[in-house]
Amino acid sequence: MSDLPELHWLHGKPTATGRLKSTPEDFKVSEDLGFTLDGEGEHVMVRVRKTGCNTAFVAEKLAKFAGIHPRDASYAGLKDRNAVTEQWFCLRMPGKEMPDFSQFTLEGCEILTTTRQQRKLRIGTLKGNHFTLVLRDISDVTSVETRLVEIQKQGVPNYFGVQRFGRNGDNLRQAWRWATNEIRVKERSKRSFYLSAARSAMFNHLVSQRLERHIYTQVLCGDAMQLHGKRSWFVAEGAELAQIQTRYEEHDIHITAPLPGKGDLGTQAQALIFETDNLADYEALWSLAQQERVDTTRRAINLLPENMSWHWLDDTTVSLSFFLPAGSFATSVVRELILLGNIDAENISE
């Protein structure tokens, strides 16, 4: 079970092939925190455009330039190295003057703006990311154009991307070994990576099973429904299923699946039976998450890209733009358009 399974597609397996990220400029990401910065406070906020640099490396260099410990530099999320990305970095500098960032030099990095903030910027503290991707050498333009229209209307499965599971799925493989007592994992960061891979794999499996059983867009009795744009959810009761189905089709609410851990899954009746039955093969991973006292959370199974648009640069090249909420993967959109090799997919950022 440690190898990454082939997940089902909402719009059918793509027939077209193509290339992503021929150059870093073919993959652009702009982070959106979703709130206005204070303009004052003990934290210096630095907006950086970077190419060919990973996030942690830039944070370390900014901390060194500012004369602070690396642990006092933070960011909201990791961005891909092999891309052009814009994001905020946060430097804790109480009582210190704003550094002269015009003197900061790092190949591939450009300081766009600086300000101050009262609170530390923590992982996950962002609204989402704006993506602009260029897909080249598309073998079946008609198919891709049709799929773009379908995705704009219906969305895509909200799968965790392959990068969530480590290079060649190694984090998931190690999670299985840990769960079956083949290895002991002491390092905190590895425990976190392996648990994340385990829970993401269970989520992906349940989403794929709903597609295979043709209940992906059908609200089941007992489904946990998430309000659009919110983290709160409620259970779909039998007497209200017709009304809830209508709200789902209007994208007002979303069907969810669990990232299993300790505590109840949150579903009831038919939906609970479906989830528990289909997690049977993942019992060891689920037990591991419970043992490590990770809370069960839920996530929408469908991802509807916002502000989606595209235009053809030439006969076989399309430029595609959209916004995704925090925690969603551009992989999920691209995999419904063209067949991607593992190397391409592993290099797509969250």
Swiss-Prot record:
Keyword RNA-binding: no
Binding-site list for substrate: 27, 129, 329
Pfam families, per database record: TruD
Catalytic activity: uridine(13) in tRNA = pseudouridine(13) in tRNA
Keywords of this entry: Isomerase, tRNA processing
Any one biological process term the GO annotation gives: tRNA pseudouridine synthesis
Leading EC class: isomerase
Homology family: Belongs to the pseudouridine synthase TruD family.
Role according to the record: Responsible for synthesis of pseudouridine from uracil-13 in transfer RNAs.
Annotated ranges, domain TRUD: 155-303
One example GO MF annotation: RNA binding
UniProt-listed PANTHER family: TRNA PSEUDOURIDINE SYNTHASE D
Species the sequence originates in: Proteus mirabilis (strain HI4320)
EC assignment: 5.4.99.27
Protein name, entry field: tRNA pseudouridine synthase D
Active site positions, chain numbering: 80
